[in-house]
Amino acid sequence: MAQAVEEWYRQMPIITRSYLTAAVVTTVGCTLEIISPYHLYLNPKLVVQHYEIWRLVTNFLYFRKMDLDFLFHMFFLARYCKLLEENSFRGRTADFFYMLLFGATVLTSIVLIGGMIPYISETFARILFLSNSLTFMMVYVWSKHNPFIHMSFLGLFTFTAAYLPWVLLGFSILVGSSTWVDLLGMIAGHVYYFLEDVYPRMTGRRPLKTPSFIKALFADDNVVVAQPPNAGIGAGARFGAMGLDPQAQ
């Protein structure tokens, strides 16, 4: 069993493995009280006035307390992050890293700007960690790249992956969870998808070209891979307990 887990971990692509490791180490550290979540959460005042710049990164690494929900989130993160890196971004590790960096920047900007707008500032002030939103962004982008994969929810109904973000949003509403986390992820995902996939087809220009200094960090082969019709099979569950599974077409 341990050998199988080790092999599974070693076979992960570099960005997925690094992000998953950082998230697990951070959350375990907080659980063991080695690190305090109060030193990790997003606080604009502390970032600007006290130069606690690390908060811009650490708020994407903490997934709250260690419990069954945490394990589901780690599975969810590992699955969709890996699917994107191995399929849509195969041979383009630098581009995938830039996607995550862009998404994190958009999410942080939304929270900072929203915190300055009357009537909704209190709502944004309660958003301390954006880790789940970044994961939801990955799901949104994956669903846009694989819109025709058939999925089922609890065996009650089937739908195509294009509607996966909306199904997950509906589930959050159903169980009484805050929808802001999901909505922010959808917004960031759509902004990226539009600028990276839609806008270039409309104008022939690509505004999100990965900077050369980021490309220099990764030894990528310039490979463009067409999406197979069953890309992502076995990748559909937000949480295994939800019964949200893809079906072969």
Swiss-Prot record:
Gene Ontology biological process terms from the UniProt entry: endoplasmic reticulum unfolded protein response; ERAD pathway
GO molecular function: signal recognition particle binding
UniProt keyword annotation of Transmembrane helix present: yes
Lumenal side: 43-96, 144-152
GO CC field: endoplasmic reticulum membrane
Tissue and organ expression note: Expressed in roots, stalks, leaves, embryo and endosperm.
Recorded topology in the membrane: Multi-pass membrane protein
Predominant location: endoplasmic reticulum
Bilayer-crossing regions: 22-42, 97-117, 123-143, 153-173
Entry's localization field: Endoplasmic reticulum membrane
InterPro entries noted in UniProt: DER1 (IPR007599), Rhomboid-like_sf (IPR035952)
Side of membrane Cytoplasmic, spans: 1-21, 118-122, 174-249
Note: Associated with ER-derived protein bodies in endosperm.
Entry similarity comment: Belongs to the derlin family.
Function: May be involved in the degradation process of specific misfolded endoplasmic reticulum (ER) luminal proteins.
Protein name, per record: Derlin-2.1
